[in-house]
């Protein structure tokens, strides 16, 4: 320790680092330092009976410019002087190396200890500066400023938040199907999950089982299980019509509905042929190819079905187009010309084996389009069973049969071009008689009789 520091602290030379001297009479002098130094002398004598007595009156206090201070504070003042000297020495070295490097493991552990800030304050006179946590509000603002889905597909309108999702999506446009083929049918898929779901259709595996007691149902897809679990959630009566989620109160449901604003989960793309709905237009276009291939294979309705299944006009195409206002009225068919054409085609087929009988009669093609497309693009607003929910106003097969077959005494719904349903009751006797005399009088046409005649003839 620097000698000048001690001299300034005690204002007297110190020999051999001794902080006090002992007199011959037994009195001990203690030295201390403070703002104004003082020297206190305390005398103690020992009585003859062995007890200690302190002569407070004979105690002499030597003070500086200030008053007296108790003697037990002197050691504290000495420690403060030593600490001040350490701070001054460390401050001089802090300009070159404020935070030293540790070469030993125990020092490094102490460096990483929670007492590190206090130790550094005692050594360098200041607390270390650590990085502060970022402001949550500023961080959220930066996240909102960033585009949610910056990776956009160049072939369609879809966008993704991750580049890997975009690369998976591009396989659909490029026709890349790396997963497969299926061991049962040889199909390939763009994603592994699609292949796994497809294999379950062959094996019948249903790994997703309902966990509610008393319900043994199982499903091959997780989405089907989630939709099924809604029927067990009696404590959540508020159900979302766009997905499988349920809620306990109405406000939670109202807060959830805006998440479907992009129509991501809504099946708004409806097939005009069969009434099936899909969430994306590409799925609908892929489904429409089945109807186009079916029409080409049967050679029926080629004058009605568009040649290109991806034609945008296909989505707005009415399968009853070109049939007039009475498209669903069975009396609009000319039964005489239809039976004559059928007989002529049968004769041609019997004379030439290489001839493929394709009935090109317009009325006959329209008839088969009606049978193959039981669901209309313009659904009736009401039926005899009451109102249906939006999106499910489809004509059932039973209603379709009752429309053209008057054998039942129940009401038959006839749908006009405007989409309104007209219910008319037709007795069974009248319908049967009119069907029997249809060839001569052009009455009510029964398509079932024509189908039976076709089955009885061989081409």
From Swiss-Prot:
Q: Disordered: where is this region? A: 1-73, 423-459
Q: Where is this region: Interacts with mab-10?
A: 390-406
SUPFAM superfamilies given for it? Answer: beta-beta-alpha zinc fingers
Q: Where is the composition biased (Low complexity)?
A: 16-56, 423-444
Q: What compartments host this protein?
A: Nucleus
Keyword Metal-binding carried by entry: yes
Q: Which GO terms describe its molecular function?
A: DNA-binding transcription activator activity, RNA polymerase II-specific; RNA polymerase II cis-regulatory region sequence-specific DNA binding; RNA polymerase II transcription regulatory region sequence-specific DNA binding; sequence-specific DNA binding; zinc ion binding
Q: Tell me which SMART domains the record gives.
A: ZnF_C2H2
Q: In which tissues is it expressed?
A: Expressed in lateral hypodermal seam cells (at protein level).
Q: Name one GO cellular component term.
A: nucleus
> What does the record say about the knockout?
RNAi-mediated knockdown abolished expression of collagen col-38 at mid-to-late larval stage L4. Knockdown, whether untargeted, or hypodermis-specific, represses intestinal genes involved in fatty acid metabolism and beta-oxidation in the L4 larval stage. Drastically reduces expression of the vitellogenin genes. Knockdown causes transcription factor pqm-1 to accumulate in the intestinal nuclei at adulthood, but has no effect on daf-16 localization.
Zinc fingers (C2H2-type): give the ranges. Answer: 151-173, 180-202, 208-232, 238-260, 269-291
Q: Where is the composition biased (Polar residues)?
A: 1-14, 57-73, 446-459
> Which InterPro entries does the entry mention?
Znf_C2H2_sf (IPR036236), Znf_C2H2_type (IPR013087)
Q: Which domain of life is it from?
A: Eukaryota
| Annotated GO biological process | cell fate specification; cell-cell fusion; collagen biosynthetic process; cuticle development; cuticle pattern formation; exit from mitosis; lipid metabolic process; male genitalia morphogenesis
Q: How does it assemble?
A: Interacts (via C-terminus) with transcription cofactor mab-10.
Q: What is this protein called?
A: Zinc finger transcription factor lin-29
